[in-house]
Amino acid sequence: MKALTLALFLALSLYLLPNPAHSRFNPIRLPTTHEPASSETPVLDINGDEVRAGGNYYMVSAIWGAGGGGLRLAHLDMMSKCATDVIVSPNDLDNGDPITITPATADPESTVVMASTYQTFRFNIATNKLCVNNVNWGIQHDSASGQYFLKAGEFVSDNSNQFKIELVDANLNSYKLTYCQFGSDKCYNVGRFHDHMLRTTRLALSNSPFVFVIKPTDV
């Protein structure tokens, strides 16, 4: 009887396990090591000030030393006419490129960026006329590496507004970025991917998040 009970329990446990085949981002379901902040919680910069919707900020690694600096738009794909890759600067003192953060909702009264709510991100940098719209963030699959990279390009709203800023450490005002599948509650960490061939650190969907702080560009 005990053997039968144990077998039934094991079978039920296996049945209840999430099926990674159901996710097109297999196998990196978002870990839930941190409780998400309330949607009523504003995102704060390194000075403790609220991050303003539509404002320009730097997103800089919260880890000093080997952690690198801020996020930059880079031209890694020589087949592309525009820079489309998001990288972590190897220089701790480099804040990266200015980034505009805007709530995905079209509420004109949304003046503050709130944690755990959908946001759109775009690089606010000078480009040539051909690449002027290739600054919006989105996730794109790379068949060669099998990774889902954070890219900049002419992404439609269904792709570019699926990001959330989640609180990691309230004492440090540090955060992580998550990407949620459109029409689904499945979310994934955006973390580092060390591209040894190109000798750079890129951002991609990952089990381990890229933890960052937000700096105003006028600092």
Curated annotation (Swiss-Prot):
GO molecular function annotation: endopeptidase inhibitor activity; nutrient reservoir activity
Species whose genome carries this gene: Ipomoea batatas
Gene3D superfamilies linked: 2.80.10.50
PANTHER family recorded: CYSTEINE PROTEASE INHIBITOR 8-LIKE, KUNITZ TRYPSIN INHIBITOR 2
Xref: SMART domains: STI (SM00452)
Keyword terms, alphabetized: Signal, Storage protein, Vacuole
Tissue specificity annotation: Accumulates specifically in tuberous roots and tubers upon tuberization. Sporamin accounts 60 to 80% of the total soluble protein of the organ.
Regions that span the bilayer: none
Family membership noted in the UniProt record: Belongs to the protease inhibitor I3 (leguminous Kunitz-type inhibitor) family.
Designated name of the protein: Sporamin A
Taxonomic placement: Eukaryota, Viridiplantae, Streptophyta, Embryophyta, Tracheophyta
